[in-house]
Amino acid sequence: MNTSFNPQRQSYIKYDDSHYLLFLNEQAAEQEDEFSGKISGYTYTGTMPDGSTLIEATGVTAENMRGKFIAGLICIEYTNDDQIALLANGEDTNEHAEELAKFKEVRAAAKKAVDDLLSRAKNQQIKRAIFPQNH
């Protein structure tokens, strides 16, 4: 994982036709600048050098963005085939029950991360609408 400082708050960026960069694990931070002293900003931790996380997501719209981003994060850990197998197996054995519990934890973490990210993005859009000269 990579952690990177950014003086501007980030949320997500369309990378190409089938990928997005999600800026997750946001933490308020300060960094020393040799010219102007301390700079306030944020750190992000992810798989990419800039602290973002690259996910696969196609056909993203405002209406389906949450689901697409959650699915993209889950697919980093589990392929679609793995997910189908986990859900089909259910809890029929102790091993399957443990695997399903772990999957549910990953899914819950992905949902929380995306909800935090989309809340941040919405707040940024509101600020831009209210204070367009500052953004």
Positions of predicted regions on the chain:
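A preference for well-ordered globular domain cores
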Residues: N2-H135
